């Protein structure tokens, strides 16, 4: 009977797991002879307030802008942009124009009932109609306005000297202040590297 019981027993549905060998790589925690030789013996520490920054005259002076966009040209572009939007069935009025070093921001206040997604979807058509490489369209947070950024024909060079010489830089309290450039409105932009996630 025991032979019949063995024949009637069904084979297991799951094959037994085979024990695999796990090979971990060795961590490179040990220092080699070269690393010991080149290790810094000590860190020179300056007394607080004893370090002086290099003078600003080591950096190039900002050149006078050869071409400044006139208020008339900005007004004409704003009217042209309103006409382009009207051609696509978008009613609204441009309230503010903010020329920056690289792009100019046109703030459009859409008429009642105009969806912002409709205007945002027209960004490629706006760029083509305004003879621009690209147009960036986004809602201005906290206001009933849509920002339309169009690139300037002549980009303004931003010099490190004018950023480091700005009053805003002197007023920063960061330990590692970085000069990033200028905002769309032409104001200097700084950030504290010590406060950034890392």
Each model region followed by its residue ranges:
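Low-complexity, intrinsically disordered P/S/T-rich segments
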Residues: 1-198
């Amino acid at each position: 009977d025991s032979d019949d019981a063995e024949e009637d027993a069904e084979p297991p549905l799951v094959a037994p797991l085979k024990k695999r060998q796990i090979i971990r790589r060795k961590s490179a925690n040990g220092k080699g002879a070269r690393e010991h030789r080149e290790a810094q013996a000590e860190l020179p520490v300056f007394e607080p307030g004893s370090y002086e920054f290099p003078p600003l005259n080591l950096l190039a002076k900002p050149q006078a802008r050869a071409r400044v966009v006139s208020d008339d040209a900005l007004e004409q572009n704003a009217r042209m942009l309103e006409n382009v939007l009207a051609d696509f069935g978008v009613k609204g009025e441009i309230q503010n124009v903010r020329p920056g070093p690289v792009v100019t921001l046109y703030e459009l206040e859409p008429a009642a009932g105009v969806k912002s997604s409709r205007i945002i979807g027209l960004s490629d058509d706006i760029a083509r109609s305004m003879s621009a490489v690209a147009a960036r369209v986004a809602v201005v947070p906290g206001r009933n306005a849509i920002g339309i950024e169009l690139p300037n024909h002549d980009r303004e060079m931003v010099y490190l000297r004018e950023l480091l010489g700005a009053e805003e830089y002197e007023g920063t309290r960061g330990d590692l202040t970085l000069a990033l450039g200028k905002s769309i409105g032409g104001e200097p932009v700084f950030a504290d590297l010590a406060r950034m996630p890392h």
